Amino acid sequence: MSSGGLLLLLGLLTLWAELTPVSTRDRPKFCYLPADPGRCLAYMPSFYYDSASNKCKKFIYGGCRGNANNFKTWDECRHTCVASGIQPRIASN
């Protein structure tokens, strides 16, 4: 296979890995933590993974403390925590 073909294959595999949501058994443990706004009073719209509904939901992060189940974007939350085969919509609290 030519170097151009190998480069194309590598690019396609990388794209596939980025677009494939995580499977249930590979989900990080922090995805099961509850939403935690922290102790500070900033107003930072964020997303957390709700394991009961298998959806990423909006919440307001205060800017400090909290926990690792806190994502700046819905896509980041979905790619990290949502089980494969399910394409949930953005859900509000």
From Swiss-Prot:
Primary localization: secreted
Claim: Disulfide bond is one of the keywords in the record: yes
Domain BPTI/Kunitz inhibitor, residue spans: 31-81
Location within or outside the cell: Secreted
InterPro entries per the UniProt record, alphabetical: Kunitz_BPTI, Kunitz_BPTI_sf, Prtase_inh_Kunz-CS, TFPI/VKTCI-like
Residue span(s) of the pro-peptide: 90-93
Tissues where the protein occurs: Expressed by the venom gland.
Signal peptide residue numbers: 1-24
Keyword Disulfide bond: yes
Disulfide bonds: C31-C81, C40-C64, C56-C77
Keywords: Disulfide bond, Protease inhibitor, Secreted, Serine protease inhibitor, Signal
PROSITE patterns: BPTI_KUNITZ_1, BPTI_KUNITZ_2
GO molecular function: serine-type endopeptidase inhibitor activity
Annotated site, Reactive bond for chymotrypsin, chain positions: L41, A42
Entry's Gene Ontology cellular component terms: extracellular space
Role noted for this protein: Serine protease inhibitor that principally inhibits alpha-chymotrypsin (Ki=4.3 nM). Shows weak inhibition on trypsin (Ki=5100 nM), and plasma kallikrein.
Family assignment from sequence similarity: Belongs to the venom Kunitz-type family.
Any further remark recorded for this protein: Negative results: does not inhibit plasmin, and pancreatic kallikrein.
Name of the protein this chain belongs to: Kunitz-type serine protease inhibitor 3
Record lineage: Eukaryota, Metazoa, Chordata, Craniata, Vertebrata
